[in-house]
Regions:
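Hydrophobic helical membrane-anchoring modules
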Residues: 1, 145, 169-236
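Generic alpha-helical secondary structure signal
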Residues: 19, 47, 105, 130-134, ...
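Structured catalytic core of nucleotide-sugar glycosyltransferases
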Residues: 1-127, 161, 187-190, 230, ...
Length: 236
């Protein structure tokens, strides 16, 4: 049985953390009896870290990392990936918009596929965010030759060994399906539920995402063009 690491970046999600951990605990035993919940606090300036510390005293499976300064979502994810002890890594946002119950359906594909990417088919976001996402995914797929509808969906299941070989720079967490394929991963997309945010606020604006995403896209396209694919026919 695979050990599963749930890796969740945290930034100013004080009101959501307890419910988040409860929902993960409710679904985790259906996937594996061996699991850990790894929360990565990106130097939150609210009460997130005290909540995490309290939960740590109550839940044996919970671990956490706390950054000395704010480093961003990509850094939080990368640190979590490297610290995770599981064979399988599952990611999600801390804002409760992802629904962990979808993991039961998604995990059925693991083994045949090395990465299962969620697709927020019916997004509970503003119209402007939906439009920006559709444009972003279209341009991204056109340039990278990808077919994933929703690379920005944080609900993902990934082979840990492959994932730890991926070099993640600032912003490149948005391109994980492409980066995992470069490691030889088989990737599938599964429709998932998407819920409205109840507490807190989004940490990004559409303009910020668009500008950063464009430069990140150029970087990933360059990485694809320089990637070495070697297939040994014979060795004696």
């Amino acid at each position: 049985m695979n050990k599963i690491s749930f890796v969740v970046p945290i930034y100013n999600e004080e009101e959501n953390i307890r419910k988040l951990v409860e929902e993960i605990q409710a679904v985790a035993p259906d996937l594996s009896n061996d699991y850990e919940i790894l929360l990565v606090d990106d130097c939150s300036n609210d009460g997130s870290l005290p909540v995490i510390r309290e939960l740590k005293t109550q839940i044996p499976q919970l671990r956490y990392l706390s950054f000395a300064r704010n480093c961003g979502q990509s850094a939080a994810l990368y640190a979590g990936f490297q610290a995770a002890s599981g064979d399988v890594i599952i990611t999600m946002d801390a804002d409760l918009q992802n629904d962990p119950t979808d993991l039961r359906q998604m995990y059925q594909h693991y083994g045949e596929f090395d990465m299962i990417n969620g697709w927020r088919f019916n997004r509970q976001d503003t119209l402007s965010k939906k439009i920006a996402s559709k444009i972003g995914n279209f341009v991204r797929n056109w340039m990278t030759k990808e077919t994933i509808h929703d690379t920005g969906c944080s609900l993902k299941i990934m082979n840990a060994e492959m994932l730890k070989n991926v070099r993640i720079y600032k912003g490149l967490h948005r391109f994980l399906p492409t980066l995992m394929r470069m490691e030889g991963a088989k990737v599938i997309e599964v429709k998932v539920n998407h819920r409205q945010r109840l507490f807190g606020e989004s940490k990004y604006t559409n303009l910020q995402r668009g500008i950063e995403g464009f430069y990140d896209l150029i970087a990933v396209r360059w990485m694809q063009s320089r990637h070495l694919t070697i297939e040994v026919k014979e060795e004696k």
